[in-house]
Structure formats: structure tokens, C-alpha cells
Amino acid sequence: MLLKNLTLLEGFKIKIIDFQKYLREYDQTSGLYPKELMQIGEKYHQKEYLSRDELYQLAHLNSTRSSYHVKKNPARRVEKVTEAAYQIYDDFCRLTLYTGLMGIGIPTASAILTALDPERHCVIDTRVWATLYNLNYFDREKENFKADDYLKIIKIVRKMAAETEFTAAEIGYALFAYDVVHREGNLHQH
């Protein structure tokens, strides 16, 4: 396991992994498809909102298990919420708006943000948190996320991206793959 320390502007060291290696590994995982995610993001940028079908497609990329709940939202509500979120720059507020829709949790909301701006955002889930936990960024594992959890993760990921040639989205995919490669036992401990 290759770990390296980087000194950041704030004067503390950040542990990173071999992102290039784990980005190559990502293609072999069950993670979402970045190209499809970016295509949905392009549509979102063009119209400044997502239709219910587009949001379902994005949610299905991220979580096939819970994406069907997206279809329970009134179509106009999805358009209004995604349009309002598009106009806001604050990450916490955007996440809160997205998660007000049925079928959208923080992991899927993070995928929406990533579709819009892969330089600044990454898709988060249990695996990304677990990798950061194993690198000693967090003191416990976690399976359910709130907007504040995303903000904690993205702060670390953006620092990693700033010190490398990778985008925040690529860092997230590499962190996901790292957990796939190194996890012993089940992902979800119930």
C-alpha cells in the first residue's frame, strides 16, 4: 500500500494514495460510470434543471437499489428543486435541496454536484468514507451521511486534488476503488 504525505498550505500533512493506480482499478469496480454522469451534467448545464427522468438516470447510476423512489416525485417538483439548486453556489444548501426529493440521499446528491463540477466535487459513499477512515481522517466508519459529512469529505478531497494533477471527482473514484481493493469482509456491517 503506497501512502505519501503532502504538506499543505495550512501546514499539516495529508495522507494520499496512489491515485493513478486506483483510478485504473476503478473501471473494474461496481462504481458508477463517470462518462454517463458527465453527460447528465451537460444536460443540466444546458437547461439549468433536470427532468424527473434525467434525475432517475443519474440516481440509477449511483444506486440501483433506491433509484426507483425518484419516480415517486412529481415531475414539476423535480424541475423546480433542481432549478433552484442550480442557482445556488453553497454546497450545504444545494445538498439540502436535492435530498428533499424522494430517492435522493447525500451520495446521490454528491453525484449531482459532481456531474455539474467534477473539478470541485466527488461522489461519496460508504467506500469513500471507509478509505478516509483507514487513512485516519475519521475516527469511525459510517454508512449514513448528512450534508455536513459531505462537507468534511470534500474538504479533504479538494486538498488532495490541489496537491495533485487530479480532479476532485477523480480523487473520489480512486478512494472508492482503494476500498474495493483493500476491504476485508462485508461492506455493510449490520
Where are these regions (language model features)?
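Short alpha-helix boundary/capping elements
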Residues: N62-S67, D117-H121, D179-R183
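C-terminal accessory module of base-excision DNA glycosylases/AP lyases that mediates lesion recognition
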Residues: M1-Q57, C122-H190
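Generic alpha-helix detector with strongest preference for long hydrophobic helices that associate
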Residues: Q39, E79, C93, T108-L113, ...
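Helix-hairpin-helix/helix-loop-helix acidic hairpins
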Residues: H60-I104
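Short charge-dense sequence patches
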Residues: N5-L9, D27-S30, H45-K47, P74-E83, ...
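Catalytic DNA-binding helix-loop module of base-excision-repair DNA glycosylases/AP lyases
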Residues: C93-N134
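Short loop/turn hinge sites at secondary-structure boundaries
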Residues: K47, Q87-I88, P118
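Sparse, context-dependent recognition of short Cys/His-centered cofactor- or disulfide-binding micro-motifs
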Residues: K4, K43, Y89, L97, ...
